[in-house]
């Protein structure tokens, strides 16, 4: 593998640790990656139907412990699985249970030493937890998602872009049963600092159909590579939305490559 190709593979691992799910770069044939993540989001305000901040009746807490796993069926086809266990409470509910379980496949539509484009299709089965951030626990039955991802790395930098930097954009359509359908747009930028450190800046946005909930969250994390292991620590904040909590909290990820 070329130096640029190896850099892209490392970027792929980091992107896949995000709540966006599938990334532009697939796993090589026979390679496996397992990611564990923990999030604890709290909010005492939310965004009303007009998108204006408003106090909640009581603090809302959502705690999630999740797993994401992927396996390279071929160099261009990757099988993926993700699921989580949730607990939370607000003024109206106090719950604990399984979140949605999702299985999908990513196909590498095109790739060279700097750029990758992929298409993803997946199926999710709802659980007792929140199957959407704006939904009541247990609401929603099953989902189908299609997602297109495009990423580009800059090994030597380019203009104001520092060396060993990458950008990725993902656009998705999620067809839901028991909840409104959604469109999603996620953007990631990352840059390497030395051999073992990386800084990531990410934005996760989406909107439910029929004038429903809308959200935009930003996240900044620092990643440390430890051989075949990596540790990611950071903070996520909801900065805009409609009918969604203004949540914030820590994000911790641990993954292992085989």
Could you say what each language-model-derived stretch is?
Residues 85-183, 187, 225:
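Outer-membrane pore/translocation modules
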Residues 36-40, 81-85, 119-125, 163-173, ...:
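Transmembrane beta-barrel strands of outer-membrane/channel proteins
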Residues 102-105, 222-227, 234, 246-258:
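Outer-membrane beta-barrel "beta-signal"
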Residues 41, 74-78, 86, 110-114, ...:
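Outer-membrane beta-barrel channels and translocator barrels
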Residues 52-55, 88-93, 132-137, 172-175, ...:
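Extracellular loop and loop/strand-boundary signature of outer-membrane beta-barrel proteins
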């Amino acid at each position: 593998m070329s130096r640029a190709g190896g850099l892209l593979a490392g970027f792929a691992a980091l992107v896949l640790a995000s709540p966006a799910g599938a990334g532009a770069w697939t796993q090589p044939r026979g390679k496996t990656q397992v990611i564990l993540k923990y999030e604890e989001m709290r909010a005492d305000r939310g965004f009303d139907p007009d998108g204006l901040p408003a106090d909640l009746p009581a603090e809302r807490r959502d705690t999630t412990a999740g797993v994401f796993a992927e396996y390279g069926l071929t160099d261009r086809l990757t099988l993926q699985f993700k699921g989580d266990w949730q607990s939370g409470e607000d003024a109206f509910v106090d719950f604990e249970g399984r979140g949605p379980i999702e299985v999908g496949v990513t196909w590498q539509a095109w790739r060279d030493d700097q750029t990758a484009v992929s298409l993803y299709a997946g199926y999710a089965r709802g659980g007792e937890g929140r199957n959407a951030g704006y939904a009541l626990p247990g609401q929603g039955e099953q989902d189908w998602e299609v997602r297109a991802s495009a990423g580009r790395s800059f090994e030597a930098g380019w203009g104001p872009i520092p060396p060993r930097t990458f950008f990725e954009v993902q656009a998705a359509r999620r067809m839901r049963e028991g909840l409104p359908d959604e469109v999603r747009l996620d953007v990631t930028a990352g840059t390497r600092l030395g051999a073992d450190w990386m800084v990531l800046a990410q934005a996760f946005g989406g909107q439910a159909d029929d004038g429903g909930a809308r959200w935009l969250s930003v996240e900044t994390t620092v990643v440390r590579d430890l051989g075949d292991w990596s540790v990611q620590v950071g903070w996520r904040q909801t900065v805009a939305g409609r009918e969604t909590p203004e949540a914030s909290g820590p994000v911790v990820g641990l993954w292992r490559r085989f």
